[in-house]
Amino acid sequence: MATVIHNPLKALGDQFYKEAIEHCRSYNSRLCAERSVRLPFLDSQTGVAQNNCYIWMEKRHRGPGLAPGQLYTYPARCWRKKRRLHPPEDPKLRLLEIKPEVELPLKKDGFTSESTTLEALLRGEGVEKKVDAREEESIQEIQRVLENDENVEEGNEEEDLEEDIPKRKNRTRGRARGSAGGRRRHDAASQEDHDKPYVCDICGKRYKNRPGLSYHYAHTHLASEEGDEAQDQETRSPPNHRNENHRPQKGPDGTVIPNNYCDFCLGGSNMNKKSGRPEELVSCADCGRSGHPTCLQFTLNMTEAVKTYKWQCIECKSCILCGTSENDDQLLFCDDCDRGYHMYCLNPPVAEPPEGSWSCHLCWELLKEKASAFGCQA
């Protein structure tokens, strides 16, 4: 049968026991603070999802022990439910709002009155504001515990606590929810402007890259303008309304009719809007989209080579050997003709893309030392 130690200080020594209790308190406070930071979490020992609570006490809450062998006592704290109610939409309650300059008096015992939901509504403060202030207060409390040094004297620590608490309460009381919401909306708008820098001059729609903006111009505004011109001329053929999927137009023989404008600069063969000079268009054999070689960043060898076969754009690109577009991450493009090859379809197969320029066997036979990969590829 275990014996009860009525006075543990005599068995272990006064200083040793105080240091052990202090280390235990510091460890527990840090552990609870770290758990509160990553809440909610699943306790691996009990299998219970832990939530934040109000059972953790501070040094300033300590009281003298009342029972034999009891070192400290802590005041009991009533359980309170976390309020997450939204203010009602009844316009009658909004007429009873009080000016924000008016503040409710404090209780005589020095603690602020715990307002009900109705009192918060009458003061013009949402319940969400109280919840946010309480959460901010708990987060600051956690950060203060984590940053607190274990070797700080107890007297200095209590003075810091007494100085920090009123500052924190004043800061949360004077915080305006409208300004925070406006700042969040402004930050979201600036983030969207940064992510989508390309803006349509006609409708104001934003895109992440220039090809997306060009596609929007071509298939939204340009298509509507062409439709209006066709109605004015009263042509027999109805205007073609292109959808976002870009269905290619086919002629009587089944071949795709190419577009007469560049998908990047929206210029025709008579003028490249980027360079201001006339330039011939290169069209995809599958979807009919067109582009200037300079807009496509083609080399001289590419510009001449794409005229000799049915060129495909990057969205329609398929392997020349197997004829499929599957495993597009394995496609390797020739730097002289822009043909696509699966790395596992090559003879011999290639495990990784080669460094530098790469030319296919057709361009090696045709260009020889003029190939882009001459001197780089064995």
Swiss-Prot record:
Q: Which cysteines are joined by disulfide bonds?
A: none
Where it sits in the cell: the answer is: Nucleus
Annotated stretches, region: Disordered: 145-193, 225-254
Q: Where are the zinc fingers (PHD-type)?
A: 259-319, 316-366
Q: Which GO terms describe its molecular function?
A: zinc ion binding
Q: Which SMART domains match?
A: PHD, ZnF_C2H2
Top-level taxon of origin: Eukaryota
Q: Which GO terms describe its cellular component?
A: brahma complex; chromatin; nBAF complex; nucleoplasm; nucleus; SWI/SNF complex
Q: Where is this cross-link: Glycyl lysine isopeptide (Lys-Gly) (interchain with G-Cter in SUMO2)?
A: K99
Basic residues bias: where?
168-186
Q: Give UniProt keywords alphabetically.
A: Activator, Chromatin regulator, Isopeptide bond, Metal-binding, Myogenesis, Neurogenesis, Nucleus, Phosphoprotein, Repeat, Repressor, Transcription, Transcription regulation, Ubl conjugation, Zinc, Zinc-finger
Q: Name one Pfam family in it.
A: PHD
Give the GO biological process terms: chromatin remodeling; muscle organ development; nervous system development; positive regulation of cell differentiation; positive regulation of double-strand break repair; positive regulation of myoblast differentiation; regulation of G0 to G1 transition; regulation of G1/S transition of mitotic cell cycle
**Skewed-composition ranges (Acidic residues):** 148-163
Query: Zn finger regions (C2H2-type) covering which residues?
Result: 198-221
Q: Per its UniProt record, what SUPFAM superfamilies does this chain match?
A: beta-beta-alpha zinc fingers, FYVE/PHD zinc finger
> What's its job?
Belongs to the neuron-specific chromatin remodeling complex (nBAF complex). During neural development a switch from a stem/progenitor to a post-mitotic chromatin remodeling mechanism occurs as neurons exit the cell cycle and become committed to their adult state. The transition from proliferating neural stem/progenitor cells to post-mitotic neurons requires a switch in subunit composition of the npBAF and nBAF complexes.
Which PANTHER family does this chain map to? HL01030P-RELATED, ZINC FINGER PROTEIN DPF3
Entry text on domains: The PHD-type zinc fingers mediate the binding to acetylated histones.
In the record, the note on similarity to other proteins reads: Belongs to the requiem/DPF family.
Q: How does it assemble?
A: Component of the BAF complex, which includes at least actin (ACTB), ARID1A, ARID1B/BAF250, SMARCA2, SMARCA4/BRG1/BAF190A, ACTL6A/BAF53, ACTL6B/BAF53B, SMARCE1/BAF57, SMARCC1/BAF155, SMARCC2/BAF170, SMARCB1/SNF5/INI1, and one or more of SMARCD1/BAF60A, SMARCD2/BAF60B, or SMARCD3/BAF60C. In muscle cells, the BAF complex also contains DPF3. Interacts with acetylated histones H3 and H4.
Name of the protein this chain belongs to: Zinc finger protein DPF3
- Give the gene that encodes this protein: DPF3
